[in-house]
Amino acid sequence: MSIKTDYGQYLNNQRVLSEKRTGRFWFEQENRYVKPFQIYGNLYYVGDSWVCVHIVDTGKGLLMFDAGNCGATAMLIQSIWEMGLNPADVKWMILSHGHVDHFGAVNFFKRMFDTKIYMGEPDVKMFQENPELAMIQESGNCTEKLFDIDVSIKEGDVLTFGNTEIEFHLVPGHTQDVLPVFLM
């Protein structure tokens, strides 16, 4: 594999994602299925055509970025298996921000696998003080409840997950702190 070949595959995958029929938000999950794929090295895409979900194999467990929409849990589990990974190995989950379409499978992973949940400090505060901003009530058929965050991330934090070190930044915009990450 070369960077050029990998980038070509990435562009093809983006085309497939953009052409996929999305269905209606928060349901019709079967219309948003995207075949999971390896992005590069130990980084995988297991999300759907609406919400990105990524997995990093850290060598000491899986790190998952976001948890999809309400109703996406079965698809995420299947996609993880399809990549040759085990969902029970998801040790950590980082939420990009505190909206319901990014934490649909959190409660399942916490209950089943004791996955530790990480989120930016301002969104953790939002969960506590203004939970309606998570938009669960707007989801119609979503039965998910808010959950406890295990680790509140601050600006500039550097955390290690297995053999993967990540630098975090809090960027206001879509919410008070959309959480871009830099894998180092």
Question: Predicted segment positions?
Answer:
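Core dinuclear metal-dependent hydrolase active-site scaffold
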Residues: 36-38, 55-57, 155-184
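Conserved beta-strand hairpin/beta-sheet module of binuclear metal-dependent hydrolase folds
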Residues: 29-87, 180-183
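Short Gly/Pro-enriched turn/cap motifs at secondary-structure boundaries
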Residues: 34-35, 45-46, 141-144, 148-150, ...
